Design a protein with these regions (language model features):
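Conserved active-site-proximal phosphate/metal-binding subdomains
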Residues: 58-74, 80-216
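Alpha/beta enzyme core
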Residues: 1-74, 82-100
Length: 216
């Protein structure tokens, strides 16, 4: 899985040992570029995805991509229950790409406060900002507030530079993304507690099956 720049040499090296490459993309420009440079599949990071994310509706994103690409597609963006997984498949994606829901599992190595924050927050607790890395992403408002910043009044970062909380000299200039500012998608309103991953997957399967064949 690659992101933030498709690289031919990485794709070629992966193919040499029999691997396949999926590349994160947020729009058609990057999707075309990824395939041109040798990626095998695409991860469509749609509106509502956690961490670095785009703003395109999953309905539009999958439909437009399927007009020219018949390879494997994973769809990302606010997928946190089995019904959403089924919806992704109906849209034309081959896989649902899920992140935030698995942060709130017992096996995840995230700190407990992060897990708890995911299970007590909802879509309105997510803020979309490029301040923390130079690339727009979705973050938990409570984690921003806990770092002493106003999540509703964040300045814009220089979009031409990637930054992870330090200046050119390495000096810390703001709280660091991922370590103190926690990424999350908008689908977390479906999550109420930290559970074992197996329990989460079993719930996904039950919800998916019910969406395919609703109980009478």
């Amino acid at each position: 899985i690659t992101s933030l720049g498709a690289r031919e040499e990485v794709n070629q090296a992966t193919h040499r040992w029999g691997g396949i490459v999926f590349h994160d993309v947020i729009n058609q420009k990057f999707a075309h570029k990824a395939i041109e440079k040798g990626a095998d599949g695409l991860i469509l990071v749609a509106a509502g995805a956690g961490g670095h994310a785009g703003v395109i509706s999953p309905f539009a994103f999958v439909a437009e991509t399927r007009r020219w690409f018949d390879g494997p597609i994973a769809l990302s963006g606010a997928i946190a229950n089995g019904r959403a997984i089924r919806a992704a498949r109906l849209l034309g994606a081959d896989f649902a790409y899920i992140g935030s829901a698995f942060i709130a599992t017992k096996e995840a190595n995230a700190v407990e406060r992060y897990k708890e924050m995911i299970t007590t927050s909802g879509a309105e607790d997510i803020v979309y900002s490029n301040l923390f890395t130079g690339v727009h992403g979705n973050y938990l408002k409570p984690s921003i507030a806990a770092s002493g910043m106003d999540p509703d009044n964040l300045p814009q970062s220089d979009a031409s530079k990637m930054s992870f909380g330090t200046d050119d000299s390495g000096e810390r200039v703001r709280p660091k993304a991922w370590k103190e500012i926690w990424g999350s998608g908008q689908g977390i309103g479906s999550l109420d507690e930290v559970v074992p991953a197996a329990e989460l997957i079993a719930r996904f399967k039950k919800e998916y099956d019910e969406a395919v064949d609703p109980p009478l």
